[in-house]
Amino acid sequence: MITPGKKFRQAISDNHPLMVVGAVNAYCAKMAGDAGHKALYLSGAGVANASFGLPDLAITTLNDVAEDSRRITQATDLPLLIDIDTGFGGAFSISRTIKEMISADVAAVHLEDQVTQKRCGHRPNKSLVDKIEMSDRIKAAVDGRTDESFFIMARTDSYATEGMTGAIDRCKEYIESCLLYTSDAADEEDS
């Protein structure tokens, strides 16, 4: 059986670049598949905005994200990448989050380096945890995997607050996670 993580890895291998389209619900996911997209993305803002009419300010829970994820993965075979924000708690909670995402047939997640009471990554005035705490989050996520093909990305929101050098320094610390994502680079050249 090909796991969702393997599907995601294959999509990355086959598509340069892989365009991962946002889908806030099962219907959007089906439309994305019909349009020929190869992978889907559910953002934290997507869950907060589309499911609850709320801003992306750490208001939603693991259960909210897991439920929306299940609805999407039950409607399509496309691999789904999920924004798990800061992981919904400390190390044990992050490990549980990963298990829940795998159980929901999610292919991949990204975990960010903001404080638990986070803001949308595209908004100003973000506060970040230190590099050691984020490295511990990544380790907890990796340790929580029950499927080695499950894809974990580390995301840094440090560009706006620490500049390019700070973002690169953080990425070097987070390299263990397989893939890095900086959400607030000013342009394509910086990212």
Where would I find each of the regions flagged by the language model?
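A generic structural micro-environment signature
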Residues: 14, 18, 53, 94, ...
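Single conserved hydrophobic/aromatic residue that forms the stacking wall/gate
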Residues: 181-191
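Alpha/beta enzyme core
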Residues: 5, 26-55, 60-75, 86, ...
